[in-house]
Amino acid sequence: MLPKRRRVRAGSPHSAVASSTPPSVVRFPDVAIYLAEPRMGRSRRAFLTRLARSKGFRVLDAYSSKVTHVVMEGTSAKEAICWQKNMDALPTGCPQPALLDISWFTESMAAGQPVPEEGRHHLEVAEPRKEPPVSASMPAYACQRPSPLTHHNTLLSEALETLAEAAGFEANEGRLLSFSRAASVLKSLPCPVASLSQLHGLPYFGEHSTRVIQELLEHGTCEEVKQVRCSERYQTMKLFTQVFGVGVKTANRWYQEGLRTLDELREQPQRLTQQQKAGLQYYQDLSTPVRRADAEALQQLIEAAVRQTLPGATVTLTGGFRRGKLQGHDVDFLITHPEEGQEVGLLPKVMSCLQSQGLVLYHQYHRSHLADSAHNLRQRSSTMDAFERSFCILGLPQPQQAALAGALPPCPTWKAVRVDLVVTPSSQFPFALLGWTGSQFFERELRRFSRQEKGLWLNSHGLFDPEQKRVFHATSEEDVFRLLGLKYLPPEQRNA
């Protein structure tokens, strides 16, 4: 329970202090916001006031003739008009402030500036508010709805993704899926969630996820999420799993054995695989986001090596960069040749070419297991493919900066970058491209839809009908969507 606040009398020295909290810089002097408290609540009003002021908005503590925008939450047009009539009358000739729904405020905060007022924002006219689609128009599967890279509910989705990640660290598949699916729905909504009523009818919003969102809407933070992010368990598991070659099971074993830092791992090299040793050796570089420019530079290097080895072969950038991301933690490439069979044995030659240039810091080669392609298609339970591939750490050349006299020494001439090279036959390329583009959750949902709604098995090798023993053929990603009866979503809309 919040402590009772002492009533401050008008004109007292304390009243001046209480109302003197606006920030030093007001970026939008023509906009003066008053947050009406009745349905909003005192703590939420205080939070929203701090948020707006931190972004340069002018928020007034008292209703007066200076107010240009009154913002209300969970209030009908009729209630808003009654509220305004009950307030002290403004001086003659003063314009009435706009009565606006909280959605105008949240959209303005997201934009970093006042957004244009639309009819849906105004409370003066009793029109039905436009809210995000509910279950009738919000498909249950992430592969049925667009998920843009930039969406309207980042704060909310990231909180649920934190809880999903923590559940994954505990091998709690049920909680992981519940939070992941709810977060994915938020990414597909066409506008910000400003009130809990907007979640009604949306798929995958159970009691727990709804409670988290409610706390975030009311207080701007969620105690459970905060505790998870600050916990030693979560931070250690996150640290260990960011090391190349370390999965959840290994990280958990190390945690149970009392290990907490990377230095402790380095002191016990006997417990590390070669891949993990390389991950620790180049950890500083590998934990630094890879820029799109770096990914494109790597593509040029790999394309040159591939052309030298097999003219006519193509190299395609996949993963998050294909979905529109400007940075990532690794770079994935698919290599193929239009004449099926020409790609066999290509990767070792490409790696040899890269090694001769001194670009390979580490690589682990996996030969192809495509001898029985029909068998690979029937592996419905496996998300791993059988393509020829190499998990690498490449040294990407960096422009050398000359050191000035007395300055720090020049920067390193290369940067370690995680790279996956995958070789696929041309007949399986559309499925491989779809699978390696992601996102991981989008692909999981696509396989679930194929299995549960169509009775088909989908993986990076192809699409298979287990009843009719039939293998489907496709020449593009669009073909795969069409075979599944789905509307095609471009890569930029697959950030589920």
Curated annotation (Swiss-Prot):
The modification Phosphoserine is found at residue 12. Mg(2+) binds at residues 330, 332, 420. The record marks 435 as: Responsible for the low discrimination between dNTP and rNTP. It catalyses: DNA(n) + a 2'-deoxyribonucleoside 5'-triphosphate = DNA(n+1) + diphosphate. Residues 323-332 are annotated as: Involved in ssDNA binding. Keywords: DNA damage, DNA recombination, DNA repair, DNA-directed DNA polymerase, Magnesium, Metal-binding, Nucleotidyltransferase, Nucleus, Phosphoprotein, Transferase. Gap-filling polymerase involved in repair of DNA double-strand breaks by non-homologous end joining (NHEJ). Participates in immunoglobulin (Ig) light chain gene rearrangement in V(D)J recombination. DPOLM has a reduced ability to distinguish dNTP and rNTP as substrates, and elongates them on DNA primer strand with a similar efficiency. It is able to polymerize nucleotides on RNA primer strands. This is DNA-directed DNA/RNA polymerase mu. It comes from Mus musculus. The lineage of its organism: Eukaryota, Metazoa, Chordata, Craniata, Vertebrata.
